[in-house]
From Swiss-Prot:
PROSITE patterns: RIBOSOMAL_L3. Keywords: Ribonucleoprotein, Ribosomal protein, RNA-binding, rRNA-binding. One of the primary rRNA binding proteins, it binds directly near the 3'-end of the 23S rRNA, where it nucleates assembly of the 50S subunit. It holds the Pfam family Ribosomal_L3. This is Large ribosomal subunit protein uL3. The keyword Lyase does not apply.
Length: 272
């Protein structure tokens, strides 16, 4: 098992070399520090405790200072344990290079809070009949239905009732890493993930899927625009180019065609 802590930045879309649009989520992954290593012998289970993002000086408590000193780091804001993550020592640093493009991961975060909601929105219950006497009395339109047997003398725990919707820990499984960018502390994940913008997320290796997909070949927009400009220039000189060529190869063929065109113009000027 392996995992890392990050922060959701937002969603955007990318294009593959085949022109397919992919919705993706950008996750900022600042370097994580190993602040504790838990073992079966000492703690009863194996895990690695990770921490990220420095705390403000005004929020630091004295006990925390000594704890983080042992890991040779400053007090951190977010601390989480990754179960069964082994092979790391106290003070080690983990960055976005932990995951590679094509890997399948599970992402956990606190979902968006949507405030107080009724049973129809919160639990997807049916709306009551809108005609034939419905909408009130014994056939309410949006009211909660039965919440238990009359002989129970109490409401059993777990009944689907109105209440606070959202703000719960949610995990979405089997999401694909589209791109990793350790230089910019960034991971690009295919699809949407839980949480609002700026939410703390935990990215772990998928527990149900062990295989790795072939990395998606993303379109390089700058390169594509440069090639389009070369294609437009090539039309003037009847030069055949294709998208499989590199920019250097295309530029070389175009330069040769321009040079030949100039050489053909020079004798014509001398004859005149």
């Amino acid at each position: 098992m392996k995992g890392i802590l990050g922060r959701k930045v937002g969603m955007t879309q990318l294009f593959t070399n085949e022109g397919i649009l992919i919705p993706v989520t950008i996750v900022e992954v600042k370097p994580n520090v190993v602040t504790k290593v838990l073992t079966v012998e000492k703690d009863g289970y194996s895990a690695t405790q990770l921490a990220t993002e420095d705390k403000k000086a005004s929020q630091i408590r004295r006990p925390e200072i000594n704890k983080f000193k042992q890991a040779n780091t400053t007090p951190k804001r977010f601390v989480k344990e990754i179960r069964n993550m082994t092979g790391y020592s106290l003070g080690d640093t983990i960055d976005a290079s932990l995951f590679q493009a094509g890997e399948i991961v599970d992402v956990t975060a606190i979902s968006k809070g949507k405030g107080f909601a009724g049973t129809i929105k919160r639990w997807n219950q049916h709306i009551g009949p809108k005609s034939h006497g419905g909408g009130g009395g014994s056939q309410p339109l949006r009211q909660t239905g039965s919440i238990g047997d009359i002989s129970g003398n109490r409401v059993w725990k777990g009944m689907t009732m109105p209440g606070h919707l959202g703000s719960e820990q949610v995990t979405i499984q089997n999401l694909e890493i589209v791109k990793e960018d350790p230089a910019n502390n960034m991971l690009v994940i295919k699809g949407s993930i839980p949480g609002a913008k700026g939410a703390l997320v935990v990215i772990k290796k998928a527990i149900k899927t062990s295989h790795k997909k072939e990395a998606v070949q993303l379109l390089n927009l700058k390169e594509a625009l440069a090639k389009n400009e070369l294609f437009e220039q090539a039309k003037k000189y009847n030069v055949e180019l294709n998208m499989q060529m590199s920019i250097k190869e295309m530029q070389t063929l175009l330069d040769e065609a321009i040079k030949k065109a100039e050489e053909q113009k020079q004798p014509e000027g001398e004859n005149k």
